[in-house]
Amino acid sequence: MIDFSKKLGAKPKEKKINPIEIYSSLDRKTDAGPLRPTQDRVLQDWDANRRKDRNLIVKLHTGEGKTLIGLLMLQSLLNENGEPCLYLCPNDYLVEQTCREAEKFGINVCQFSQLDKYVIPVDFLNGKKILITNIQKLFNGKTLFGINANCVKIGSVVLDDSHACIDSIKSSFSIRIKKDNDLYGQLLQLFYDDLKEQAYGTLISIEQGSSELLQIPYWAWIKKKEEVARLLASQPDDMSVKFAWPLLKDSLEDCQSFITGNGIEISPIYCPIEKFGSFTKAAHRILMSATTQDDSFFIKGFGFTANEVQQPLTDKVQKWSGEKMILFPSLIDEKLSRLSMIKLFSNEKIAVSRFSIVPSFYMSQDYHYEGCVVANKNSLNGIIENIRRGQRNKLNVLVNRYDGVNLPDNDCRILIVDSLPICDNLSDRYEMECREGSEVTILKQVQKIEQGLGRSVRGEKDYSVIIIIGSDLVNFMMNHRTASYFSPQTKKQIEIANELVESLRQEILDSARADALKCVRLQKF
């Protein structure tokens, strides 16, 4: 029989708010050891000096344990004020991975139910558990969290892999209409004369399906914005329009539009993040970031001050985490070309887990011909589970996945980064074509490459070999001007790789000379 008098007389248990103490008290699994030195130092610094900061950037090297740091910060703030705490990931794959990490460390979290994806978990709303979900759940025109004044109040929010999240946020404001959609033809017809006057030859190529790019003249766009609105509003349930239209419908004059033979893109010149009050009005906004990234969007997009961006929370004594060896095969010997490397590492006799990152599905065809596995968002989890079960004979291919995929330890011992990344959207592509070689475009490419290099080494004891193939990427990384924009760690790894190239070239030359001398001696006899 329950004695309710004891329950009524019991004092509420005091909740710890020091993140180090919280971690010590968690019911962790046996393989979850103590905090790493970096995690310990960062959390102590945050608790002592930065926990009152509304806007905070946490900058650490890839594989330093940012996920656990973010979860412990949220748990600390949840224990302190009891307000809803939200942990946002770039994609569903990382949502599942973060939930597994939380379970491993004994942190109480919740997710959207698979049975009812349209109901926000009550444990999150009541401040009992941290909600882990993908960035698209919050940032879209039909968000369950509400837009403008009608939004769910959130106490604290963490953006994990914040630069990958930024790409998703920008995408949420964009309308992308494919050529086979009736809207494509209607919009093309609306601006046909304007495009013809601008570049009639390119327009003809676009009509024939060319990937060439034109921007719709801004004066024509503004003049015809009402006709554009009428066309888009007539298709409210079209999946290319549905989730972005509520965000753009009253500000088309502040948008820009681009057209190719494959589709049309409409995107805002400035992303009105303020529409998402759950994020912009949160008491604490914590962005987890790698040390190599361009942080300009934190200012112009999220409203962070320059001072907040210039003073991130870092580990002042951090060292390199894990071991990477970068190799440039084509610089050692021209016979070690891109296609020869694909053929070599596609050999199923190689019983080592290996992945290749390619910029497009078109370029993945070379792998498909060799029997490799080209992953998509639905198959990636299964591929990694197969690797963990010992099935490591296949080379797996990630298409344009330079971020949002973590491949620690035996998940990936050989990582191939194939060719220079390409732009995800037409506005970035247009900027790159107009400002080729500018610092802005170089930084964007460097950021993508650095993100790709960080997929395979995720911890202090982790290691992998990274193979760089594709002449455009090799030239970009070896060019003194563009190489200067990489992080100090990557620049050092490129320097070591270059020394190795010179050493191996000399060995090959010496070996060839020795063989030639042997032939000469044999000729004498």
Which residues make up each language-model segment?
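Conserved pre-motif I regulatory segment
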Residues: 3-59
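Conserved RecA-like P-loop NTPase helicase motor core
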Residues: 386-475
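Conserved Walker A/P-loop ATP-binding site and its immediately adjacent core
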Residues: 64-115, 136-140, 291-297, 357-365
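Structural recognition of the conserved hydrophobic beta-strand(s) that form the central parallel beta-sheet
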Residues: 87, 131-134, 156-159, 284-289, ...
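Inter-Walker segment of RecA-like/P-loop motor cores
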Residues: 93-97, 102-149, 380-387
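Conserved helicase motor "Helicase C" RecA-like lobe of SF1/SF2 P-loop NTPases
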Residues: 358-378
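Conserved coupling segment at the C-terminus of the helicase ATP-binding
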Residues: 41, 51, 55-57, 61, ...
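Long, largely alpha-helical accessory region at the distal end of helicase-like NTP-driven motors
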Residues: 459-525
